[in-house]
């Protein structure tokens, strides 16, 4: 089923999606989320506590749209456990929420592959 929440109540239920989401997850197999980075971070955290996959469509500036300018990079943990700066325009814009290092967006985290030591 589809549940819609808008902060202003213009569609669906009024409120932030993080308010009612806990009650919706009991029979949920996967979460698809799009919106501001703060909301995606919050939903991904909730999903991780319930061990539910969360596909997050990030809203990142994509100046060139083909990966050359590197303005859309995000720190994402790979299947090998290594953090890499990935381009959301070419390798995304959808990422597993538990793999994005939400607190490190806008910088290169320590230990990132190819990053400063």
Q: How would you label these PLM feature ranges?
A:
Residues 1-117:
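Reductase modules of NAD(P)H-dependent flavoproteins
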